[in-house]
Amino acid sequence: MKNEMNYYEISREEWRYFHGRGEKYTAITDDELQQVSGLNDRISLTDVSDIYVPLRHLLQMKYEQFRENQIKQSEFLEIKPHKTPFIIGIAGSVAVGKSTTARLLQLLLSRVYPDKTVQMITTDGFLYSTSELKQKGILDKKGFPESYDMPQLISFLNAVKNNVAPVKAPKYSHQIYDIIPDEFDIIDDPDILIVEGINVLQLPTTEQIYVSDFFDFSVYVDANPSLIEKWFLERFDLLLDLAKDDPTNYYYPYAISDRASAFKMARRVWRDIDLRNLNDYILPTRNRADLILHKTKHHLIDKVFLRKY
């Protein structure tokens, strides 16, 4: 274990032993793992036991501390304890595997807390719709800070944190590459909420309250940009395969066109939009996370950085 300035750097070999010996753990199956895995994200049951079970154990500790602190504060104020959800933020680049991490943690925490409600949302639902982005003249900056309705996202999190149930979160579809009109995810009195998105650790200058102010723990999924580009293009290839027989799919025109031309467009999107967004707005938030999962080739997590204080 290396002792960095703000983080403990822990190798995979060391981290795998921090799983909470003797604690009840309900194993997940290969089929369940495939259901939570994102497109082109490679993960195995070994990854679950080596990386995610210790992380689940850490989150259990944090959650129990959080609940105890809530009770003590209520006693201090001489008020009835108010149920407040424990919120976990998960950040990182596009195509790095945030969604897989979020869904897997939701599954693991649901297993260890079968009597608790563990829900998850993605901040993609708080992007402005394509029509709104066009009106604002920022369609080419989709994913950048200005493309999100941050007041709506902050209002949503404030309602969740104050246990104003149920709360609606807009739904986003990668199939149509837009907000789904009149469809919502309902967040109803969760004990634990996982919020996943590229922007969850950002500090917009236009806001006085930040998304991360509502988090009780945060995770950043990290990898070398050259690897993320590779995963981005591999995912794009899979999206084209899935879209080739569906004219309603956003990727259908690219799927039925010349594949080389489609990839030329995808590389341009990565270079001009996603890489720039990563370097300018996402990567600078990495050191605000409580824990960093560092990935190497084939999505293998080789080390973990845990914030000291």
Curated annotation (Swiss-Prot):
UniProt entry keywords in alphabetical sequence: ATP-binding, Coenzyme A biosynthesis, Cytoplasm, Kinase, Nucleotide-binding, Transferase
Gene Ontology BP terms: coenzyme A biosynthetic process
Cell location: Cytoplasm
InterPro entries reported for this sequence: P-loop_NTPase, PanK, PRK/URK
Reaction(s) the record says it catalyses: (R)-pantothenate + ATP = (R)-4'-phosphopantothenate + ADP + H(+)
Annotated GO MF terms: ATP binding; pantothenate kinase activity
Enzyme class name: transferase
Primary location class: cytoplasm
UniProt-annotated binding residues for ATP: G92, S93, V94, A95, V96, G97, K98, S99
EC numbers on record: 2.7.1.33
Domain of life: Bacteria
GO CC field: cytoplasm
Pathway named in the protein's UniProt entry: Cofactor biosynthesis; coenzyme A biosynthesis; CoA from (R)-pantothenate: step 1/5
PANTHER family for the chain: URIDINE KINASE
Family: Belongs to the prokaryotic pantothenate kinase family.
Classification via HAMAP family: Pantothen_kinase_1
Protein name from the UniProt record: Pantothenate kinase
Organism in which the protein naturally occurs: Latilactobacillus sakei subsp. sakei (strain 23K) (Lactobacillus sakei subsp. sakei)
Lineage: Bacteria, Bacillati, Bacillota, Bacilli, Lactobacillales
